[in-house]
């Protein structure tokens, strides 16, 4: 597992389509698979384009279940709400803009927690604190790259200067 240096970038808010879930950790791969299959169909039906890799946004700290929004950034908001249209559960989401700490995790998904630990340490050293939920952009496609040691996940975490 390799974590790149953490850097601060400024992002614009990004429209996305996503599926929400409260998922037991062992069920996450299946949940992501279903979301990453249904969102492209919903985007096509709404006439918007996918404009980036799939992501998982994590609104709260994991416990017995993980709250997650899984989807894709899209070219424009669609007005979709969960439970409407042909792709039930797919809804508009806005990925946050502003200052974001980013680090590239290379390795299996089950080791990405190590990147979060490194980022939290870095934030503390820089006098920064989380300012919103983190998300992971899954840069590598496991179907195209079968070696988990080569998978790349961009971890993004909104930040602000600590008080």
Where are these regions (language model features)?
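A solvent-exposed interaction/effector surface
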Residues: 1-163
């Amino acid at each position: 597992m390799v974590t790149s240096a953490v850097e601060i970038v400024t992002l614009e808010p990004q429209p996305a389509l996503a599926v929400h879930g409260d998922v037991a950790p062992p069920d996450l791969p299946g949940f992501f698979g279903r979301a990453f299959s249904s969102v492209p169909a919903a985007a096509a039906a709404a006439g918007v384009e996918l404009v980036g890799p799939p992501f998982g946004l994590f609104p709260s700290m994991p416990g017995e279940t993980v709250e997650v929004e899984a989807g894709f950034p899209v070219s424009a908001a669609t007005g979709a709400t969960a439970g409407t249209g042909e792709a039930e559960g797919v809804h508009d989401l806005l990925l946050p803009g502003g200052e974001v700490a980013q680090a590239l995790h290379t390795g299996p998904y089950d080791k990405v927690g190590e990147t979060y630990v490194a980022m939290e340490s870095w934030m503390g050293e820089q006098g920064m604190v989380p300012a919103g939920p983190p998300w992971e952009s899954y840069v590598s496609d496991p179907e195209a790259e079968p070696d988990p040691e080569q998978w790349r996940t961009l971890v993004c975490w909104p930040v602000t200067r600590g008080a």
